[in-house]
Amino acid sequence: MPESLIAGIPVHFPFEPYPVQRAYMEKVIQCLRDGTNGVLESPTGTGKTLSLLCSSLAWIRTRQSEHQQQMVKMEKADFTGLGGGAAGGDLSELAKTMGRANNWGVPKVIYASRTHSQLTQAMRELKRTAYANMRSVVLGSRDQLCIHPEVMREQGNSNKTNMCKLRVHSKTCSFQMRVESRKDHPDLRGPSIMDIEDLVKVGQRLKICPYFASRELVPQADITFMPYNYLLDPKARKANKIELGNTIVILDEAHNIEKICEESASVQIKSSDVAMAIEDVTHIMQVFASGESQDMGGDEPKDFTLDDLTLLKEMLLEFEKAIDAVVVENAVEGTTFPASMMYELLGKANFTYGNVATIVSLLDKLVQYLLVASQQMTIRKGGTFTMLSDLLTIVFANKEDVMSKVYASFKVHVQLEEVKQGHGKQQGGKQHGGWLGKGTIAAATGSIKVAKIINFWCFNPGFGMEQLLNTQVRSVILTSGTLAPLKPLIAELAIPVAQHLENPHIVDQSQVYVKIIGTGPDRQQLISNYANRDNPKYISSLGQTILNVSRIVPDGLLVFFPSYPMLNKCVDAWQASGLWADISVKKPIFLEPRSKDQFTSTMEEFYQAIRDSKGAVFMAVCRGKVSEGLDFADRNGRAVIITGLPFPPLKDPKVILKRRYLEANRTRENQLLSGQEWYNLDATRAVNQAIGRVIRHRNDYGAILLCDSRFKDASQVQQLSKWIRGHLGDRPQCSPFGPIVRELRQFFKNAEANMKLPDERETDSPLETVCKTENEPIAAIPKVKREPGSNATFKSANESAIKVEMANSIKTWTPADYASAAGRKLGGAAPNAMDFMSRLDSNVSSIDFNCCMDSKSGSSGMVKIHKRERSSPTQPESSSQVSKKRYKLVENIKVEPSSSQVKEAPAERADFLRELRSLVTQDQFRRFGKALLEYKDGTYESFQALMVILLDVLSAPKVRYMLVGMRKYLKNEHKDEFDQKVGKL
């Protein structure tokens, strides 16, 4: 492939890069070289993904080459005199070998996007480049990767996750057990790039679990592909063992990144969920009391006791009572409270930072217990326990020392929910020992009509981004086709950005026709605001506009509405008036369905209809599946009509609170948007994304028709993507409908005559990335003339198998996805990577029963029991008796750190080595140097050899602080074992 020198780095690109691609790659390389962050916009169709992959991996490959040269030089270095002053040069080289803190070796790339279909497209792009032989891996969910037949039969992601955990824990999954012995198989470690489907095929062939096998590939991968939720949520990162130190994080399709950051930190719980959780606990207690637990859960002792259940039920009853006491003043819109109210509610039930890890662990064990029991009898599978676990995990995710930020960034909103009669009815209608709570009894008898919904909402996306930056990543690059305007985005995310870019489109001005249509054929104003959207004249005029445009636009026509209600309202009116039938005569009409199954079949029918000479119309909704993830290149989308601005619901509580948050926190320094500016921008970004479905590559062409007179307002125009603004001019105006019809007809006549046909452009499917990587420049392909009105038959990509089953297949993430992590440590809030060492230098507290150890230690916070240890069901049970009997609270006793703990190792490499040489003998220092050189490749064997030397040389109390200081020079995958070995000293 041709090589281009970009920002001093040789980049192999499939063809001579266009100016916009070169500018984009320069910005990427500058970010990686300087260790800074970037926000880069490049319109869809400009080869953004290809440019991103080639530039980042070219820089990685260059760094790898430099690193190898340095290692060769180090191998030739003379370390015989390391103990003396004459070896200053060699000492300097050894310091370079050690690298910076958390910076051993070459950085790695993490490429994240919204959906797995987008990740698959990116991996297909990578396969066509000169970097296809670089090591890569994709991380997916159990729902996508599991091949165990019984787990696959489970309904819902949460049930599959819990069933998988159960089988792994009980060692009854043969696929997972084979991973260790076959993880180095050539089919798994080979040079070929494997997407989700490829991983599943390899797993089936080797009879190993693709989910766990993919995790084994991560440490050696140069680039790892994963969905956003694996990356942005700190708990998900911990569960998937994702190390971010010295990594390059690329967030593609980042136009919704603020919302994703907010939603990953938000959670909801219903009082009806709490009531059902109480029922489930009560049922398990009844089973224990009757001695039937062996029948339900097998012969193994349970990981919880009857006393554990008693205490949990007391806490849930108190939580239910606290929720019942909340006064909702506005029954329609709900009532808003400060974030502290959530901690007060949970505190009344004794859910605290001190015991939340223990409670979450117990809830997870109960879910697994019910999963086993559900195989033998009809019983709920613990979904309410999962919801409670999600709530506690998210609410207590942040450490207590950042609570001021939490209070500023979150709000609690309480709404009322109608409850069905008899919902949550107790099985068998029995009350056991007076343990049915008031809410449970009321729900069972139908005496209450409403339940409360407790929402814990985050409104500060910068809160999550700050946590990401604190992991010591090298660079974060946010990129998309529709990020503009950039300043508000950067301000909300609150990250330092050194590089930013708004690229023009790669297509020529003559290939795009953009107009604002302010009136329909009958001169009725087109404006889809609240006051006009029910106007029959407006709806009729909009339908006539679409009818006239459908007569002119060849092939595919996309029509986007602000919302589903507006789409349905127009469809009903047009069907009643006959306009629907008139449009259908010109082109068959397809409507965007909401269900995944219907969506797949509808897309297949639409692509099939495009083959017909009439084409087809697809009516969809902004922010829907079609507007966010699909490619309508060439004939699939020759024009897009935007019927209105998709503003968020003005009276929605979340929208109201977001606007209030911005107004309350806006300053001149942080440059946050006002509430109204954010409201307008949210609508325009959805429009930009919908527009991006057409004009998908260098030789594509199409029309963009903005059918709402408000698009002429300067405030709206400035929020459109830069390349669209260029077509509207400095002072855009609404054009009369008649001239637009004539211009549009002439535009398509010229385009069909001068642009090359879609069948000449090689594609795999309409859903794949369209920026292909031909070996020759696209511009070199000769243009083919098509006679106007020709009914030529196209042998296009549509005639190949149309793969729509993965289109925009967004997997909804829940905290249950990370709750199953193997080797999980259930402390309070998840500590960061340096917490182990930083705690050696701080005050130490004694351990109480709330402290959870790793289950392997045999000293968990929850005590395993046998049946003989159960409390007697006939014994009077009170909360005080139970607590005294099973749980003993221990006061935290502070221990002052020793002098060796207080002292810290020098931060600079050269200073570190000089001090070490002054503390140890010449022979010890020589052994240390040799072991460090042998560790250059970072293999596990070389790590073990290095640890032997470190523990021998640096375990003495007076030099142990130097041992602690060595941690930052180790590879990330070796740090946990290092911590364990040092912790035993």
Swiss-Prot record:
Subcellular location: Nucleus
Binding site for ATP: S42, P43, T44, G45, T46, G47, K48, T49
Annotated binding of [4Fe-4S] cluster, by residue: C146, C164, C173, C209
Stored Gene3D superfamilies: 1.20.1160.20, P-loop containing nucleotide triphosphate hydrolases
Pfam family, one: ARCH_RTEL1
Domain of life: Eukaryota
Residue interval(s) of motif DEAH box: 252-255
Disordered, as annotated region: 858-884
GO molecular function: 4 iron, 4 sulfur cluster binding; ATP binding; ATP hydrolysis activity; chromatin binding; DNA binding; DNA helicase activity; DNA polymerase binding; metal ion binding
Parts forming coiled coils: none
Keywords: 4Fe-4S, ATP-binding, DNA damage, DNA repair, DNA-binding, Helicase, Hydrolase, Iron, Iron-sulfur, Isomerase, Metal-binding, Nucleotide-binding, Nucleus, Phosphoprotein
CDD domains referenced in this protein's UniProt entry, alphabetically: DEAHc_FancJ, SF2_C_XPD
Family the entry assigns: Belongs to the helicase family. RAD3/XPD subfamily.
Protein name: Regulator of telomere elongation helicase 1 homolog
Source species of the chain: Drosophila yakuba (Fruit fly)
